[in-house]
């Protein structure tokens, strides 16, 4: 019961604070006059919850409505003392039968005239459940507390009325009319000029996806926007300088010199000869994948080429042959004992006759890593080599050649100057009025009262709230990780001493939810009575500090206890 009273007090205070701020919203209909005022009107016993002397106020008053539970001399220590504070529940003449007897041990909960006997007495606090009119007869009667759902004006008539807090969703101009209106913040995505036309430089804008020339025609055109990747000097010319850090691949010519050789540029991707025609060597091009001889026949050396995948003997027949190249994994000595031994088990990689040498054949292709010409010299064969990374023009000079568009990162105007230009597509996020100011205007929309806060229930933990908007970074505290208010899970990590956005400290009175609908919610879980006021105040002030909403007027934390 005490816990019920705690929760009801918090709920009443929250609702009271909301109603105090949001007059005259139709939500106030929940307060005056209420369909359940019958629960409070005199003479019902329930009014004893608020009547004078108020039973609830007795939570601090003397004597308490439940002093009967503790009546002196016994206090809670009476749990072992005699007589017990609850001996009234059992003491003769009334025992538990007092549920029917008069007076009841808990009559203090209701104060005369009506006591708990009202369960049978007339008039009962809940006789309304059967009496006429009932507090909920409104569910069928007219007007109903929710007739407003159909009646006019409704607490939420704003959902249909004009102006609605969200009438902008249908009204003109709407906060998002720009989604359809002209000009739209993003009409530039299709309009000319675009906010990001700077990304493309005139004349092409994003419309260039269909327009001619295309922003990426430069991928084929000359000069390319990225030709600067090829300009001189390049930021990575050092990759091309002499000596190179990796020139120590040491061999001359390099196995990849073919990747670098002038003169073809990246444009050669379509040009003739291709920078990689060396992969295929004339006359075959990529079609050589099926042609004979193959561009990579060098990898295998004649007679076997890549066709060796079907040819006999296969370069890998050794995988099936006997002895296997790796039988040494089981054999003695082991193939790797040679890491210290002489000769090495993998000298076979270079010397005939091991089966693995099939990868090399005669002359061994693998040995070509040192041999001349290399099996992959085709990858490199002059004129083009990898040296093109240093040569001029570079194979990718197209990526860099002036007038480089990419240089716009430093040029004026910048491609993203629109992000700073006026007007911005998102200036409305800072402009006044905001498209959504209706959601936060003062007086606050009626509907926001439905979302200001809620009471999450009693006795069991609430479900985790959806992640809300990020709040301000919280102060650092033990164990060190700082959580951001308003978020749960990965953002606000659980840790003592507990903070809004994290699970609350354990307590005896179940769970209390402070719910901030639409922006996430904080759970203040298992709050001990002595800590609830501070925890609620923190949650409240954190909410107001992190969100500049129209209901920030609810700055005063709800009173508790």
From Swiss-Prot:
Signal peptide start-end: 1-20
InterPro entries in UniProt: Collagen
Keyword Ribonucleoprotein in annotation: no
Sequence positions bearing 3',4'-dihydroxyphenylalanine: 22
Segments of this protein annotated with the region 13 X 10 AA A-P-P-P-A-W-T-A-W-K: 41-410
Disulfide bonds: none
Transmembrane segments: none
Residues carrying a glycan: 46, 49, 56, 59, 66, 69, 76, 79, 86, 89, 96, 99, 106, 109, 116, 119, 126, 129, 136, 139, 146, 149, 156, 159, 166, 169, 176, 179, 186, 189, 196, 199, 206, 209, 216, 219, 226, 229, 236, 239, 246, 249, 256, 259, 266, 269, 276, 279, 286, 289, 296, 299, 306, 309, 316, 319, 326, 329, 336, 339, 346, 349, 356, 359, 366, 369, 376, 379, 386, 389, 396, 399, 406, 409, 416, 419, 426, 429, 436, 439
Stretches the record annotates as 27 X 10 AA A-T-P-K-P-W-T-A-W-K: 61-440
Residue list for modification 7'-hydroxytryptophan: 46, 49, 56, 59, 69, 76, 79, 89, 96, 99, 109, 116, 119, 129, 139, 149, 159, 169, 179, 189, 199, 206, 209, 219, 229, 239, 249, 259, 266, 269, 279, 286, 289, 299, 306, 309, 319, 329, 339, 349, 356, 359, 366, 369, 379, 386, 389, 399, 406, 409, 419, 429, 439
Name of protein: Foot protein 1 variant 1
Species: Perna viridis
């Amino acid at each position: 019961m005490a816990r019920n009273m705690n929760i009801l007090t918090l709920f009443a205070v929250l609702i009271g604070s909301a109603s105090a701020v949001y007059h005259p919203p139709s939500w106030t209909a929940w307060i005056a006059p209420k369909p359940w005022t019958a629960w409070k009107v005199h003479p019902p016993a329930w009014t004893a919850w608020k009547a004078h002397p108020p039973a609830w106020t007795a939570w601090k008053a003397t004597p308490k409505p439940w002093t009967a539970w503790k009546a002196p001399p016994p206090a809670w220590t009476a749990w072992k003392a005699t007589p017990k504070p609850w001996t009234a529940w059992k003491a003769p003449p009334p025992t538990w039968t007092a549920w029917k007897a008069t007076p009841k041990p808990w009559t203090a909960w209701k104060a005369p005239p009506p006591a708990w006997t009202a369960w049978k007495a007339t008039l009962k606090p809940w006789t309304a459940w059967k009496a006429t009119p009932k507090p909920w007869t409104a569910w069928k009667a007219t007007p109903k507390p929710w007739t407003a759902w159909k009646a006019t004006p409704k607490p939420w008539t704003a959902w249909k009325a004009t102006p609605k807090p969200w009438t902008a969703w249908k009204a003109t101009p709407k906060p998002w009319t720009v989604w359809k209106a002209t000009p739209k913040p993003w009409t530039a995505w299709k309009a000319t000029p675009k906010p990001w036309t700077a990304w493309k430089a005139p004349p092409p804008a994003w419309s260039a996806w269909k327009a001619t020339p295309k922003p990426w025609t430069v991928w084929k055109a000359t000069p390319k926007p990225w030709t600067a990747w090829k300009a001189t000097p390049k930021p990575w010319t050092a990759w091309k300088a002499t000596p190179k850090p990796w020139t120590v691949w040491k061999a001359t010519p390099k196995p990849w010199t073919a990747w670098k050789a002038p003169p073809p540029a990246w444009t050669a991707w379509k040009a003739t000869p291709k920078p990689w025609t060396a992969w295929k060597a004339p006359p075959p091009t990529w079609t050589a994948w099926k042609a004979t001889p193959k561009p990579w026949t060098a990898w295998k050396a004649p007679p076997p080429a890549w066709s060796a995948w079907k040819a006999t003997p296969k370069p890998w027949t050794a995988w099936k042959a006997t002895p296997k190249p790796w039988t040494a994994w089981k054999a003695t000595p082991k193939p790797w004992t040679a890491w210290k031994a002489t000769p090495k088990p993998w000298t076979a990689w270079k010397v005939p006759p091991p089966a693995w040498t099939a990868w090399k054949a005669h002359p061994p292709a693998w040995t070509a890593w040192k041999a001349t010409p290399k099996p992959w010299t085709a990858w490199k064969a002059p004129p083009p080599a990898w040296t093109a990374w240093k040569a001029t023009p570079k194979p990718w000079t197209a990526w860099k050649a002036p007038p480089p568009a990419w240089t716009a990162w430093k040029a004026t105007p910048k491609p993203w100057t629109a992000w700073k230009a006026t007007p911005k597509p998102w200036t409305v996020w800072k402009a006044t009025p905001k498209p959504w100011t209706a959601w936060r205007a003062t007086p606050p929309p009626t509907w926001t009262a439905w979302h200001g806060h809620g009471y999450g229930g009693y006795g069991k933990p609430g479900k985790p709230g959806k992640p809300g908007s990020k709040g301000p970074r919280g102060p650092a505290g033990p164990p060190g990780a700082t959580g951001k208010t308003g978020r749960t899970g990965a953002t606000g990590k659980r840790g003592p001493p507990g903070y809004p956005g994290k699970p609350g400290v354990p307590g005896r009175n179940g769970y209390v939810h402070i719910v901030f609908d639409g922006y996430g919610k904080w759970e203040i879980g298992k709050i001990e009575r002595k800590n609830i006021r501070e925890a609620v105040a923190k949650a409240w002030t954190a909410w107001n500090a992190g969100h500049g909403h129209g209901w920030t007027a609810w700055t005063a934390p709800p009173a508790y206890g």
